[in-house]
Amino acid sequence: MATYAVGDIQGCLAPLKALLKKVRFNKDKDLLISAGDLINRGPESLATIRFCMNLGSAFKMVLGNHDLHLLAVAEGVRSAGNKDTVEEILQAPDRQQIFHWLRKQPLLLQANRFHIVHAGIPHIWDIKKAYSLAAEVSQTIQSVQRKSYFEHMYGNSPDVWRDDLKGTERLRAITNYLTRMRFCSHKGELELKTKDRKTIEKPFKPWFEHKRHGRTENIIFGHWAALKGLPCGPQLYAMDTGYVWGGPLRMIELNSLEITEQPQLT
């Protein structure tokens, strides 16, 4: 059995299929894991999500910010933007089935000895705490409180974690760390506006450059296309190489650590 983790697909189904063909993916014995942002921006969001759903137990994913945005639009608390490519999903006859399936996906999951998350895991949380906090959001998304969650999901505050945070502020902070984070300070303060490492100012630096205080887990993440998949440090695997922006689509096999990429299709 081979286990593959793939970066941000964002509705680009053709390169995903090409990647799976390259590695001779067999849905009867292999597993594909998406690091989030399964849909949006690319040309085939509906076909992509249907394809992954049809893989059944051969597919797992964590939710990314674009996936959560779709669910917010589905709840009627947000409108699709000019750059969004989710209208086909919103009009699909099976849209309720799609939304139900998407709401059941976690924000953090473990496969083999790897932890997969969309944006990252802040150094101020140990791994047990990260899973516990991620579960708080997942449980809310699957509950009758989900509309309220999505109404209050957007925003950059609170910008630093406190254990005494409650309600919508607590859930927003957890969501921002796991699905939007790029830079943070030593204290865990988030800086959510900057994407370029060259322009970030102190005290902020990439979340993965902070000491993890004895944590040694392997982390696979997406979200940050500007990194271009360059090495981020030991046991860290950046998978978003920005296919939707002209880069390749990247996939890693978790046993061999072999990386396979699909360049832009013409």
Regions found by a protein language model. Give the residues of each.
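N-terminal active-site segment of His-dependent metallophosphoesterases
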Residues: 1-51, 55, 68
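Residue-level marker for buried hydrophobic side chains located in beta-strands
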Residues: 5, 32-34, 61-62, 115, ...
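Divalent metal-coordination and catalytic microenvironments
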Residues: 8, 37, 64-65, 102, ...
